[in-house]
Amino acid sequence: MKITENYMEKVYAGWLGKIVGIRLGAPIEGWTYQRIRDVFGEVWSYPVDYKNFAADDDSNGPLFFIRALEDCEDLNNFSSKDVANALLNYAPYEHGFFWWGGYGVSTEHTAYLNLRNGIPAPRSGSIEQNGATMAEQIGGQIFIDSWGLVSPGNPEQAAKLAEQAAGVTHGGNGVYGGIYVACCISLAFEEKSIRDILEKALQYIPDDCEYARVVKAVMKFHDEHPENWRDCFDYIFENFGYDKYPGTCHIIPNAAVMILAMLYGHEDFSDTINICNMCGWDTDCNVGNVGTIMGVFAGIDGIDYDKWVKPINDFLACSNVVPSLNAVDIPFGASYFAKMAYALAGEEIPEKWNTILNERMDSCHFEYPTSTHAIRSCSPGDCHIRNTDEQAYTGERSLKLTAVTASGEESFFYKQTYYSSEDFDDSRYDPFFAPLVYPGQTVHLSVMPLPGEEMATTAQIYVKNGATGEIIRGEKVKGDGEWHALSMKIPGGQTGHISEVGVILCGVAKGFAMGDVSAYIDDLYFDGNPDYRLEFGRMQPDSWHVTHQEVPQFAKLKGHSYLDGQYLSLSCADFAEMYTGHHLWNNYRVTAGFKTCNRYGAFCEYSSAGGHA
């Protein structure tokens, strides 16, 4: 089946819907229906505001397990072993990423240790290995979205991929749930009715399995009692509640409320995810899956921008072991899924998207409607950021920036390129970060500053050293209503880290004046060779809480790491690994000073590294 013209917009809407659902459900995860009703009455918007929403297992899994498609040796013989390798390659050892509740308690933890100790997939997640209770918990479906997103209108492919993926950690109904959700997402690209999606996805799981039974039972109840979703929840609670199934978070009760929400939500994105959230239980997982299905089905236009999208601002924090992949934007994930979808379909990427998907996936291109690529602002007055098709340097869209300011005042619009604990309210799933851009590299930005009536606008490219606070300024252009392709090489050899890249807008008038300064920006990206130093003696630990202490700019797979004077120290009882830098670097050189001590085992101290490509 040929990938349709609207696929790119729908894959973005689906991934965006997933992130919206996770954020909506996370603050009340594990709450019962009654507790939510007693505390909130009804929940029709985000219960909590965040500086930035921290990492979450429900987004970590889909974004990193799908990398098995790119990393595998033979796409034609793709199997659960490839997904198992992705799990081992990208998940830290017993911290971050997902819930490490203990062997025999957490399904994913159990499967991970099985793999680490030589039990291969799919045996690693099977009922035969771990028992039905462990194998049929909810994780089989919560990490599965990406396999549907790479299979638009192709549920057969979605089912095959989801079976391989879910089987790494789950078995039985845990796998059937993964297949069902992936097929619903795949079908949502083409189908015109949610009911048709729910019915057709049943074709891909056994008709007599418990998962199929609960789906059909909830649909039957809805047919007979279509008026009130709360009546349906009472039915689910009595017949498919948590007391009916073993384990900490069984898949069946949670599947039931997902079906309820999609039937009683009347094909409206907001109503559907809110109803799902008010049902309680594993809210971020359930609303996340429903958000993906409904996002694909409704498209960008069906997702309320001010209510759901604007608070997220396209930002996504993650917690895999590759630190430069932990501060991404939602367009990056959508573009990665799209690249894999075209590879699986054997189709050429459309010309409009070719450069983005093959060369500049992590750029700010603004081609997805409503996308901001997490551009932020800092200004004395009000600022407005809006995706638009009014202008574009390349493609069809750009980002319009407006600040209300006085003559001579500067307004900063920027991509934050490094994050730390101070940027978050909590430490959920223990994220850690490396910078996205480095000294020695070149920043590119296209800008069109607008003339204005009372004040002319100037635009100047800049970067900020997050350690020193220094603002490094580049070329400045005047507001003439024309596009200017600016570039700026960041001085090499610096210590610290680059925390912001962007544009400074300033209003210029003959005397004092107040008014708007505006500009369009497009195609913000970085290239060139890094040339920088890490001086550990100048660093302070990034302290999230007592059990989450990070060395700045590093990720850790396993081991004990800490700053010790001018050294980074890493020790272990068996093995330890840490990583820094960017995942796209190759052919580079690092110089460092080492001290080793192996009297009582392995110990390494690593000092003052400098690297360049």
Report each predicted region and the residues it spans.
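Structured, active/binding-site neighborhoods that engage oxygen-rich ligands
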Residues: 1-472, 496-499, 506-507, 514-532, ...
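Secretory/extracellular carbohydrate-interaction modules
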Residues: 570-613
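Trp-centered recognition loops
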Residues: 440, 446, 478-487, 586-588, ...
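Short structured motifs
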Residues: 427-431, 470-474, 487, 574-579
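Extracytoplasmic
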Residues: 475-482, 510-512, 560-561, 573, ...
